């Protein structure tokens, strides 16, 4: 499902998927631990389910479960006082200025239950932040608008201003903030 970690340094631990995953689960998540001169840093990378639409019988519940499993997993790591970086295609635009599509499109997406900035999705993202993870982009650019996804069919990347969403994120624990 497109999840990988590349590093010059060999990890001391690798977990593919969540420990609670069933044998037939999609492995959309990888966790590696690195030793940097006695400082352990856990790097978690995911290709989060897109969810399609809140009415979809399998994709939306899969996204909800993924976020619940991830939040539980992070809380377990936090209980061990782990330094963490969580990154990936999270498929959620958490704030209004992370949305770079027309107001009419926003209204249509919300009315139709299209995923990316539904209220419940934003709650799932906020649950990650509530574990004391911080949005690195927002730490550097509090009011900035940078988009990471563009619909290739409508060529939103060709327009000025560009049309898309910020759905790719890097979150980290506060003890790593000086590394930004």
Question: PLM features: what roles do these ranges have?
Answer:
Residues 1-55:
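Structured beta-strand-rich core segments of catalytic domains in phosphoester-bond hydrolases
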Residues 1-14, 143-144, 157-179:
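Conserved beta strand-loop-helix elements of the APE1-like EEP
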Residues 3, 29, 46-49, 63-66, ...:
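Long, contiguous hydrophobic alpha-helical segments, chiefly transmembrane helices and signal peptides
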Residues 11, 48-53, 91-93, 141-143, ...:
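Short, solvent-exposed loop/turn segments at secondary-structure junctions
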Residues 15, 94-96, 180:
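Activation segment
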Residues 19-20, 48-67, 108-113:
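Surface-exposed cleft-lining segments at the edges of enzyme active sites
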Residues 66-163, 167:
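Metal-dependent phosphoesterases centered on the DNase I-like endonuclease/exonuclease/phosphatase
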């Amino acid at each position: 499902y497109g999840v990988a970690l590349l590093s010059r340094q060999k990890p001391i631990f690798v977990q593919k998927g969540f420990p609670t995953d069933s044998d037939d689960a999609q492995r959309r998540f990888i966790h590696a631990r690195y030793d940097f001169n006695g400082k352990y840093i856990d790097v978690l990378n995911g290709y989060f389910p897109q969810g399609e639409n809140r009415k979809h019988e399998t994709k939306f519940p899969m996204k909800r479960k993924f976020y619940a499993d991830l939040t539980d997993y992070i809380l377990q790591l936090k209980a061990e006082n782990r330094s963490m970086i969580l990154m990936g295609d999270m498929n959620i635009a958490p704030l209004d200025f992370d949305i770079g599509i027309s107001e009419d499109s926003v209204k249509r997406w919300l009315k139709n239950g299209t995923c990316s900035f539904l209220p419940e999705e934003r709650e799932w993202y906020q649950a990650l932040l509530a574990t004391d993870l911080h949005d690195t982009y927002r730490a550097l650019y509090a009011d900035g608008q940078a988009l990471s996804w563009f619909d290739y069919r409508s060529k939103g990347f060709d327009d000025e201003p560009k049309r898309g969403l910020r759905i790719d994120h890097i979150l980290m624990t506060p003890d790593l903030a000086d590394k930004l």
